């Protein structure tokens, strides 16, 4: 059975991805910043499908620890983990640094583990700050 590492497993989009992956016959390893959220995620998934092929690992966007070992037995990766700040961040260390460094950690671990495919996501947050009077459009991202 092919396995997918889903980072940010407690997030809204991740819960839907995990459920769909399990429904479609994949095993899932979900990463959590805090393992205290495992039961919450497991219960949410169980409302849709049995969680027999769901496991969890602890990963932090700002730490190298665990990334290589977590990815080593996976075939695919969906990188959804990213900090979310309500309101404008005080500085880039709150939002930009964890997002970019976490993405680099995910990609390096995927390369080392020879992951077949990686899916990266983004958010409107990527273009929302620093443009006070601008209406954003598709020209603001690639």
Please place each PLM-identified region on the residue numbering:
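N-terminal Rossmann NAD(P)H-binding glycine-rich loop of SDR-like oxidoreductase domains
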Residues: 3-26, 31
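A generic structural signal for alpha->beta connector loops
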Residues: 25, 51-53, 115
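NAD(P)H-binding glycine-rich loop region in Rossmannoid oxidoreductase-like domains
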Residues: 35-37, 46-101
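Beta-rich interaction modules in large eukaryotic scaffold/regulatory proteins
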Residues: 42-43
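Conserved Rossmann-fold NAD(P)-dependent oxidoreductase catalytic core, especially the SDR/UDP-sugar
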Residues: 83, 89-142
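SDR active-site strand-loop-helix element
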Residues: 7, 31, 77-81, 120-124
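Short, surface-exposed alpha-helical segments at coil->helix boundaries
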Residues: 15, 38-39
């Amino acid at each position: 059975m092919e396995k997918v590492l889903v980072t940010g497993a407690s997030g809204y989009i991740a819960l839907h991805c995990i459920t769909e992956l399990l429904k479609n016959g994949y095993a899932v390893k979900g990463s959590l910043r805090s393992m205290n959220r495992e039961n919450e995620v497991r219960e949410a998934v169980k409302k849709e499908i049995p969680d027999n092929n769901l496991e969890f690992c602890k990963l932090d966007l700002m730490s190298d620890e665990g990334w290589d070992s977590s990815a080593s037995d996976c075939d695919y990766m969906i990188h959804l983990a990213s900090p979310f700040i309500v309101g404008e961040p005080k500085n880039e260390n709150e939002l930009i640094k964890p997002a970019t460094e976490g993405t680099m950690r995910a990609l390096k671990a995927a390369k080392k583990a020879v992951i077949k495919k990686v899916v990266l996501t983004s958010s409107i947050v990527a273009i929302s700050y620093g443009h006070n009077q601008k209406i954003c459009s598709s020209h603001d991202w690639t």
